[in-house]
Amino acid sequence: MRNKLLLASLCFPIWLTAQVAVPMKDMSFWKTSSATNWQIASDVTADFNKRNDMTASVGTGVLVNLPNEKNRDNLVSAAEYGDVDVSFDFMMARHSNSGFYLMGRYEVQLLDSWGVKNAKYSDCGGIYKRRRYTADSTEILWEGHAPLQNACLAPGLWQHMDISFQAPRFDAAGKKIANAKYIKITMNGILLHENVELTGPTGGPIEENEAATGPFMIQGDHGPVAFRNLKVSNFNGKAAELSDISFNVYYGAFKEAKDFLNNKPDSTGKLEKLTWEVSKEINDFAQVFKGTLKIPQAGKYKITTQMAGKNAVKVGDKVILPENFSHTSNKRIASVDLPAGDVPIEMTVYKTDGWMQPILGLWVESPNFRPVSFHSFSSLMAGTPNDPILLDAPQPTVFRSFMDFNVSQWGKVEKRIVHAVNVGSPDKLHFTYDMDNGALAQIWKGDFLNTSPMWDDRGDGSSRPRGALLLLNDAPPFTKSVKDTLAYTPQSEAQFRTLGYDLAENGMPTFRYRIYGSEVEDLVEITEGGKGLSRTISLKNTANDLFYRVATGKKMLQLADGSYLIDDKKYYVKLMNGAKGTVETVGDNSFLMVPVKDKLQYSIMW
């Protein structure tokens, strides 16, 4: 069997951390300032059509910067941090500019970069350049790191960023021995940076020197910006250690652990790091590893293992992972309360399946430190990884595949769309259309598709979006009543029948189907300027009392220009040609419903 999961095997397990939400009821998290540009609000709205325009509503829950000529201070946290994970939602006003500094020294740029084709270091999510001045005050910039993709959404929409940061390291004499590092930065679900070292502070730091800790700093002198759901995981604790590692190796096709545990081992020894490579064979062997975990403080710890074959783990006098069979790519996880001090650990594994490559890994983590690995790099080399099979869209591209809709971070799939049509464009705006119900299921910006799940090895027929994904609603959009907002209309009642699609000269498809006796043509195009989608629904033999569900979301707000902010400011919808909609609310969900005669046209911007 081909081994496809090396990269997944080398990844850290999912982190469980003591994540703390920054209070948004007052400014107590931040140092006091005489300037009044920073304030707490209940909500904010940025006018899509006005430069640097943002308004705040009285209340709590949102941190907002509204600078003017006299009040434009940066915001600095009262506490200092070293290794840290930070996540937050943020909103940019049109053409606004800000920056989030880790340790007050290393800036991640926040900017209205909506529609930028090729992002630079100065665009949203970029790591800003270093800066110095010559004797004649000439500015010199160097380094700087552009994001891998432009994942920036339109101004006035809530966006999300996750940052994992490692502080610089210093020896006892205060000499720097390791650079600061952005371990990972993602924005709107898209990877922007990974393992980027910073040789020194970026432009505009709180101080030019480097230190082991420092405060958060947010620029306040450039333009309006808002934050909510700011959460911090502080990794300031001493990490666990593993010492006194010994091993026993037994050769044979053992069916149970009792078949070898009382035997004399064929090989024994000591190790600095765990590795399965103490075995001379890649199959029909058993291994027992023993060591001492040095636990820095009493508390809850997560222990993760990765072993091929039957395996078990004992910590102290407790079996935390009973014997079970694991594939090469499987991780096993246990959460356990441990006392401070030395705690024995024992790992047993035996393997008789020749089709699996051997593998061995051990990680330990706590809320106070990131996962620490105690195995050699080569011990996780489960084979040569296959290159990803990526599909770009240098011209309008139509690609049929299965598409998993609404996949959770744990891999749970709400629905597999089996008659999905994925349409890509050189403007880097793409969408998935469900031919089983006429729904525009999802849209995304960035790169087009990862087709590895479809074409690698046996494949499962599916592909994955590669950009910043926005889920819409995979449900039949037509209903016979404005109150019929609950999505899934029975096909027997609607008499839905797909009629395929036609390709225009530019390569874009027009989808055709029949529903409620009406013949429908559905054309989705890229808007002028490549910043959104335009959708035109044309009907023949239109049924009476036919309504179209344009959008679904938790909250909807109609703006002064008649457009709508959908699903708590995730995207914009604008009805065209005088169409009038109504917002219907059922429980926590709202639906934008429009009566349809012969034609409906609307645009989506995000």
Protein language model annotation of sequence segments:
Residues 1-20:
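Bacterial Sec-dependent N-terminal signal peptides
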Residues 19-263, 268-273, 281-290, 294, ...:
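Carbohydrate-interacting regions of secretory-pathway proteins
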Residues 20, 26, 78, 378-523, ...:
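Beta-strand-rich N-terminal accessory domains
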Residues 86-88, 159-165, 216, 230, ...:
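Short, well-structured beta-strand segments within conserved domains
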Residues 178, 186-190, 194, 306, ...:
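Short strand-turn-strand beta-turns centered on an Asx-Gly dipeptide
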Residues 198-206, 274, 313-334, 557-593:
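Solvent-exposed beta-strand/loop surfaces of large extracellular or lumenal domains
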Residues 234-302, 306-394:
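Extracellular/secretory pathway-exposed regions associated with glycan biology
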Residues 515, 534, 542-553, 574-606:
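Beta-strand-rich recognition/accessory modules
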